Curated annotation (Swiss-Prot):
Glycosylation, residue list: N249
Keywords: Calcium, Disulfide bond, EGF-like domain, Extracellular matrix, Glycoprotein, Growth factor, Repeat, Secreted, Signal
Subunit (UniProt): Interacts with ECM1. Interacts with TIMP3.
Protein's name in the database: EGF-containing fibulin-like extracellular matrix protein 1
Similarity comment: family membership: Belongs to the fibulin family.
């Protein structure tokens, strides 16, 4: 009895001695745990609460010792070796921590979980037991405190795959992308994850099998406003002629060519996607549709001017011959030089005709005729020479345009003195050798001179029109002459 008591006391002493020698202060915890100053121990971090969208692809997040698991929403959970229960799937991304969870065996061994979950370290898990069921995987584990990290720098800890011990004796993630220990292809981008890594395709590419292939953004409308050009890993937008890309590099806006680079020679009008040039009056667009060429209006029509058309840059003007003036821009009107200026002497009278003027003597009477106050040349009865001559001669002047249309009444002759019981007859005494005129009697005392052949000027034509007066009983016979000077102008206006 005394021997047993002695052994017991010795054992207690040894235990007490060992506890005293191995006392170590713990203030740091492994990944997945944090120090609880109240309870003075490491406690598990619920990543399902603090990690946004911890699980992807419709998986549910279940907290795990030192990490978390991503499980199908229909997975079953066995708690403390009880029978499986169908768990109502929680909302995506919500916490589902429990003492027993369903997971694939590969999850527990590798530490990398589908959908993003991971197990922090083997020491923290405290040795979970994985069993495969018919429709589920069962992890049976004994809850254990996480491994605390001693302050002794020489102390070695065991880290999960994808982690390594740091100089502060904590498990830290291995950056496989920086270390070059990943197996991503040359056309892929390595993305470091906690405890692992992922191979992604660069922007503009998508994974097809094990390769990254270009995404043809142009087949996914509406990227570009007008035209899309696909390039390896990207794309760019183009605009049709007359448009340019806006600041967003997507929308096409109209280019105002009239403001930016006006190519029009005269007038520019901007339209959507293009522009048009117009010319001022008197010009027309050339074949290049940009420059303007003068329109030779004089060649387009022969009826613009009455006499002569003169082309000028952008316009035209009309000219008239000497003796005429331009009226209403196109018509020629005779200038009456007798009213403005003339070179006739005092003993001459000025006679205006179409296109000019002429000076005639104020006293045209020739011997034996004498001038009367009525401007008539009368042959005195007392003069024997007058017996075979017309009793009187009257001088008249008229002007007609060249090439006047025929037949045309041009002059009327009428008796100034009417005698009773007399008969008057009219005839062309001279000046009608070529038959240009015809005298038509219109009444017993008058007749009309008719132009029957066109006359071209400039020329002067003198016609003697005679009126014979005979008494009805034949007692006397007399003759009077009207000497008509017809001046034909040089033009038809």
């Amino acid at each position: 009895m005394l021997k047993a008591l002695f052994l017991t006391m010795l054992t207690l002493a040894l235990v007490k001695s060992q506890d005293t020698e191995e006392t170590i202060t713990y203030t740091q915890c492994t990944d997945g745990y944090e120090w609880d100053p109240v309870r003075q121990q490491c406690k598990d971090i619920d990543e399902c609460d603090i990690v946004p969208d911890a699980c992807k692809g419709g998986m549910k997040c279940v907290n795990h010792y030192g990490g978390y698991l991503c499980l199908p929403k229909t997975a079953q959970i066995i708690v403390n070796n009880e029978q499986p229960q169908q768990e109502t799937p929680p909302a995506e991304g919500t916490s589902g921590a429990t003492t027993g969870v369903v997971a694939a065996s590969s999850m527990a061994t590798s530490g990398v979980l589908p959908g993003g979950g991971f197990v922090a370290s083997a020491a923290a898990v405290a040795g979970p037991e994985v069993q495969a069921g018919r429709n589920n995987f069962v992890i049976r584990r004994n809850p254990a405190d996480p491994q605390r990290i001693p302050s002794n720098p020489s102390h070695r800890i065991q880290c999960a795959a994808g982690y390594e011990q740091s100089e502060h004796n904590v498990c830290q993630d291995i950056d496989e992308c920086t270390a070059g220990t990943h197996n991503c292809r040359a056309d892929q981008v390595c993305i470091n994850l906690r405890g692992s890594f992922a191979c992604q395709c660069p922007p503009g590419y998508q994974k097809r099998g094990e390769q990254c292939v270009d995404i043809d953004e142009c087949t996914i409308p509406p990227y570009c406003h007008q035209r899309c050009v696909n390039t390896p890993g990207s794309f760019y937008c183009q605009c049709s002629p007359g448009f340019q890309l806006a600041a967003n590099n997507y929308t096409c806006v109209d280019i105002n060519e009239c403001d930016a680079s006006n190519q029009c020679a005269q007038q520019c009008y901007n339209i959507l996607g293009s522009f048009i040039c117009q010319c001022n009056q008197g010009y027309e667009l050339s074949s290049d549709r940009l420059n303007c060429e003068d329109i030779d209006e004089c060649r387009t029509s022969s009826y613009l001017c009455q006499y002569q058309c003169v082309n000028e840059p952008g316009k035209f003007s009309c000219m008239c011959p000497q003796g005429y003036q331009v009226v209403r821009s196109r018509t020629c009107q005779d200038i009456n030089e007798c009213e403005t200026t003339n070179e006739c002497r005092e003993d001459e009278m000025c006679w205006n005709y179409h296109g000019g003027f002429r000076c005639y003597p104020r006293n045209p009477c020739q011997d034996p005729y004498i001038l009367t106050p009525e401007n008539r040349c009368v042959c005195p009865v007392s003069n024997a020479m007058c017996r075979e001559l017309p009793q009187s001669i009257v001088y008249k002047y008229m002007s007609i345009r060249s090439d006047r249309s025929v037949p045309s009444d041009i002059f009327q002759i009428q008796a100034t003195t009417i005698y009773a019981n007399t008969i008057n007859t009219f005839r062309i005494k001279s000046g009608n050798e070529n038959g240009e005129f015809y005298l038509r009697q219109t009444s017993p005392v008058s007749a009309m001179l008719v132009l029957v052949k066109s006359l071209s000027g400039p020329r002067e034509h003198i016609v003697d029109l005679e009126m014979l007066t005979v008494s009805s009983i034949g007692t006397f016979r007399t003759s009077s002459v009207l000497r008509l000077t017809i001046i034909v102008g040089p033009f038809s206006f």
